[in-house]
Amino acid sequence: MIRVRIDIESEEINNSNTVIASLLTLEVLFGQKEKRKMTFDSRKKQIIRIGRIKSDEIDFNFNDEDVSRKQCMIIFEDNNWYIVDGNGIQKSSNGTWFYPEKYYNINEGLIIRIGTTLFECNYLQDN
């Protein structure tokens, strides 16, 4: 089983809760030979593609037979990160396990199963 942590850090303007940028960190905690950590900035990338294949189309890939070639996407829209199964048009062949909504808002502590991989979502706190 692969365990992945997702950390999100948001920058705010004048305490108005207006998000100008959000950093999303995906970290493999358990299950692969090498530990990996990738951070995505919403100002540069609004769609993160997750899957099994290594290609220019996949931003975060896993060597897991139970993960589809194009498993899911994490999308930054309306100042929030969302996860959606498949490539946005077609669902993944192996499924992404979360509530049965098309787009699911990534909240603090959310756990998502993709194949045998577990994702845990947490927000980074600015100190």
Language-model features: where?
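Intrinsically disordered, low-complexity acidic Ser/Thr-rich regulatory segments
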Residues: 1-63, 122-127
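Forkhead-associated
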Residues: 41-115
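Short, charged beta-turn/beta-strand-edge "cap" motif at the junction between a beta-strand
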Residues: 117-121
